[in-house]
């Protein structure tokens, strides 16, 4: 990056990654004062603030763009230099991806497994709601993101992966207690459901679309674990919207029942990644796309 001292941007990156100046200084093996000075020099060069100094610190819009560029350069550097100096393979290639919890719980790890076993890669998986994974790609925190959004980010491409078919399921006992006469507006209001976090609107969309219930009218537990959704449903704690590929065994055994067999939610998945890729990143995208298209309904 012309005119930019890498050490200055590294300081900004460390403050964001370590969530503060003190830990950033420890990471870089310099003083907090030196970290602060480097960021000030960078801001002076760019003629604008790059860091919002709150707790934890966060980058400004310009800071995000600069960090995105810096992280791309660093990743390419990590990938290319070992090819030039093959004896220097002491550092793994650091690859950060953003994924939704349902993909992680079903097909993503088997898709990446061969690459992780054959390459010297340090994987960092950031798990977010399906609607928020692209934010990580926009900010430059990750090199790729699995999302339900089809819109392409500038400088990136979006490849279709397949469908996630979400079924509304519960244990037989739960069905008997709350839905013995079928699922209706009246019994949905009293039956507990589950959402991943406060950004997860899938549950609300389902009851609004099919049962005309207004947002906020149903009870929902909040659990940030896709695997826990299955356990909560089989334990009879709540009814859940879960991908069919994740619970086929439980359905076959009768541990779970599809309480709305005529109704489901279908969500398309896309792999968003840099348009300019090479080496390991190209291989990663190819493996991920190929596996997903075999594992997911098309």
UniProtKB/Swiss-Prot annotation:
InterPro entries: ArgP, ArgP_gammaproteobact, LTTR, LysR_subst-bd, Tscrpt_reg_HTH_LysR, WH-like_DNA-bd_sf, WH_DNA-bd_sf. Keywords: DNA-binding, Transcription, Transcription regulation. Residues 4-60 form the HTH lysR-type domain. Pfam families: HTH_1 (PF00126), LysR_substrate (PF03466). Transmembrane segments: none annotated. CDD domains: PBP2_IciA_ArgP (cd08428). One of its GO terms (molecular function) is DNA binding. Residues 21-40 bind DNA. Belongs to the LysR transcriptional regulatory family. Controls the transcription of genes involved in arginine and lysine metabolism. Homodimer. This is HTH-type transcriptional regulator ArgP. It comes from Photobacterium profundum (strain SS9).
């Amino acid at each position: 990056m012309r005119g930019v001292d890498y050490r200055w941007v590294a300081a900004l990156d460390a403050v964001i990654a370590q969530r503060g100046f003190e830990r950033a200084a420890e990471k870089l093996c310099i003083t907090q004062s030196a970290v602060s000075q480097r960021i000030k020099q960078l801001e002076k060069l760019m003629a604008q603030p790059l860091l919002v100094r709150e707790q934890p610190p966060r980058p400004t819009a310009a800071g995000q763009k600069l960090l995105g560029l810096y992280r791309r350069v660093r990743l390419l550097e990590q990938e290319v230099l070992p090819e030039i100096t093959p004896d220097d393979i002491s550092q793994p290639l650091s690859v950060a991806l953003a994924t939704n919890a349902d993909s992680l719980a079903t097909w993503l790890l088997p898709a990446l497994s061969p690459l992780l076993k054959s390459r010297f890669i340090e994987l960092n998986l950031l798990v977010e709601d399906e609607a928020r994974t692209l934010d990580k790609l926009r900010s430059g925190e990750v090199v790729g993101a699995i999302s339900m959004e089809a819109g392409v980010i500038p400088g990136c491409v979006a490849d279709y992966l397949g469908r996630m078919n979400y079924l509304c399921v519960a244990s037989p006992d739960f069905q008997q207690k709350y839905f013995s006469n079928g699922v209706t507006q009246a019994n949905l209001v009293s039956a507990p459901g589950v959402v991943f976090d406060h950004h997860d609107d899938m549950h609300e969309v389902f009851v609004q679309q099919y049962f005309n219930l207004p947002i906020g009218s149903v009870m929902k537990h909040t659990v940030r674990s896709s695997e826990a959704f299955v356990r909560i449903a089989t334990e009879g704690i709540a009814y859940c919207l879960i991908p069919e590929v994740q619970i086929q065994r439980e359905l076959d055994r009768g541990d779970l029942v599809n309480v709305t067999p005529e109704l489901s939610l279908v969500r398309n998945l896309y792999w968003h990644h840099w348009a300019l890729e090479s080496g390991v990143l190209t291989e990663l995208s190819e493996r991920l796309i190929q596996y997903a298209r075999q594992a997911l309904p098309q």
